[in-house]
């Protein structure tokens, strides 16, 4: 690290000479202090030029708050010493504030003019794309809109009766024409209601749209953020993992569509009075999703390729979806493994897409394994949930293997999936031969192969070991051919 700047008197000529020498020696992606390229460190870019530096390399006397920030979102502004000042300046946000404080009138005009000219910078680390992003628009938005238009007009709409009667054959996303007849019910809900019921200190994950990374906030902070005018919010944010089935005020009053209630595999196989080692059902059935306008969730697979029901209470949503074909899943895996993933718009590499626009009151159903991205034109509030089903057993297992190959963190996988598969095997054996007729041969083989993995630990309730359970299931399959499938 270079020697820190001292506090000795510096003349105007000295400042100009130093600025010229510094600009001459700069390279955009090399820290001017340590000359290194240590990408594991937090970086920040100068507002007035393309220069990046390591935050920890900035001299302490240049810090407005006297201490280094712990994360990039704490940084309000940075200006290097090559722009007519004796030393660099790193300004930090107030610790308890989510939006920038009002500036003095004489500076506010200059600041507003600058924002109109180039927009506020996003101080995400250099190794997350090496591009200067705008805080209020995700860089893939234009590509998303082009792809959305390309695949528009292909979406299908069904009635609630058709959804119920033809659920086993449903292989594409659909809008429900008459959601009021689907069985879906939700109480009156918004951010204020959530804060009142859960409490202002309730902790939740909030996604930063630009980085697609989560931060821990309180419900009170989120309510304050959503009640802040769009133009002064510090960043675009999303809440997509707030599960509320355990909250009596919501869990008991939110009713899922009948087609979901009738086909949820967990409800089908989970014991009414589970043993302590089995425990409670996975909490994935009832989520609240809240998004600020311009929020964007990049392409993803829902954990274990679960199917999704999605009821929009307020705002607007745009979905872009692609089926789980071998080619699309292969492109998805390659994209996940690419070091430049954040710079690549995956939609340009996928085929057979479909797009949907959702408005308040819409009920949307996504079948298993669809790769999708979501854009939010307006502040929105959604109730939805995930579910496994016998119809898609082999797809669920295929997606779980992709999650393993792409090293998805356990936090973002389906809770207790191995246990659900073990319980499914026991449930099938308890109802021979009729229950085997409910799944295809492909599903049965996929289930057996998955459970045979020696790394998978499962203790059956009615068999001495997992091996004896699987032997019984294999023998049953030999004498009872499962359904042939659609």
Curated annotation (Swiss-Prot):
Gene Ontology annotations of biological process type: chromatin remodeling; positive regulation of transcription elongation by RNA polymerase II; regulation of transcription by RNA polymerase II
Entry GO CC: nucleus
EC number(s) given by UniProt: 1.14.11.27
Zinc finger (PHD-type): 28-83
Cofactor (UniProt): Fe(2+)
CC cofactor note: Binds 1 Fe(2+) ion per subunit.
Gene Ontology molecular functions: histone demethylase activity; histone H3K36me/H3K36me2 demethylase activity; methylated histone binding; transcription coregulator activity; zinc ion binding
Residue ranges annotated for the JmjC domain, each copy included: 245-404
Residues making up the signal peptide according to the UniProt record: none
Protein family: Belongs to the JHDM1 histone demethylase family.
Domain notes for this protein: The JmjC domain mediates the demethylation activity.
PANTHER family to which the protein is assigned, alphabetical: PHD/F-BOX CONTAINING PROTEIN (PTHR23123)
Name under which the protein is recorded: JmjC domain-containing histone demethylation protein 1
Taxonomic source organism: Eremothecium gossypii (strain ATCC 10895 / CBS 109.51 / FGSC 9923 / NRRL Y-1056) (Yeast)
């Amino acid at each position: 690290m270079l020697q820190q700047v001292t506090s000795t008197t510096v003349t105007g000529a000295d400042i100009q000479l130093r600025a010229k020498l510094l600009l001459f020696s700069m390279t955009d992606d090399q820290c001017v202090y340590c000359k290194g390229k240590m990408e594991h460190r937090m970086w920040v870019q100068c507002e007035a030029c393309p220069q990046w530096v390591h935050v920890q390399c900035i001299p302490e006397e240049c810090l407005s708050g006297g201490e280094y920030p712990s994360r990039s979102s704490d940084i309000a502004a940075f200006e290097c010493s090559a722009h007519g000042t004796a030393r660099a300046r790193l300004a930090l946000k107030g610790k308890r504030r989510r939006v920038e404080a009002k500036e003095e009138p004489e500076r506010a005009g200059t600041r507003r003019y600058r924002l109109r000219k180039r927009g506020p910078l996003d101080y995400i680390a250099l190794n997350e794309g090496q591009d200067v992003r705008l805080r209020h628009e995700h860089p893939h938005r234009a590509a998303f809109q082009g792809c959305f238009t390309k695949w528009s007009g292909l979406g299908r709409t069904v009635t609630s009766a058709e959804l119920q009667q033809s659920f086993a054959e449903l292989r594409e996303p659909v809008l429900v024409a008459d959601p009021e007849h689907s069985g879906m019910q939700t109480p009156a809900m918004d951010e204020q209601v959530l804060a009142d019921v859960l409490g202002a200190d309730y902790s939740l994950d909030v996604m930063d749209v630009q980085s697609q990374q989560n931060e821990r906030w309180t419900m009170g902070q989120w309510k304050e953020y959503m009640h802040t005018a769009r133009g002064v919010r510090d960043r675009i944010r999303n809440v997509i993992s707030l599960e509320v089935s355990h909250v009596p005020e919501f869990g008991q009053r939110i009713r899922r569509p009948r087609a979901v209630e009738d086909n949820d595999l967990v409800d089908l196989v989970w014991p009414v009075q589970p043993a302590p080692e089995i425990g409670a059902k996975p909490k994935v059935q009832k989520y609240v999703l809240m998004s600020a306008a311009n929020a964007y969730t990049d392409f993803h697979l829902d954990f274990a390729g679960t199917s999704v029901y999605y009821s929009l209470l307020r705002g607007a949503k745009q979905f872009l979806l692609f089926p789980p074909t071998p080619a699309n899943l292969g492109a998805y895996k390659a994209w996940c493994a690419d070091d430049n993933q954040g710079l690549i718009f995956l939609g340009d590499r996928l085929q057979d897409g479909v797009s949907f626009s959702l408005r308040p009151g819409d009920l949307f159903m996504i079948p298993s394994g669809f790769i999708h991205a979501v854009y939010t034109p307006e502040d929105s509030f959604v109730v939805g949930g995930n579910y496994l089903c016998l119809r898609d057993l082999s797809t669920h297992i295929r997606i779980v293997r992709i999650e393993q190959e792409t090293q998805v963190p356990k936090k973002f996988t389906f809770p207790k999936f191995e246990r659900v598969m073990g319980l499914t095997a026991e449930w099938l054996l308890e109802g021979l031969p009729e229950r085997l007729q409910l799944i295809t041969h492909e599903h049965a083989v996929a289930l057996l192969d998955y459970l045979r993995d020696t790394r998978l630990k499962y203790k059956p309730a009615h068999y001495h070991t997992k091996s004896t359970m699987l032997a019984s299931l294999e023998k049953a399959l030999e004498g009872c051919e499962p359904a042939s499938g659609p």
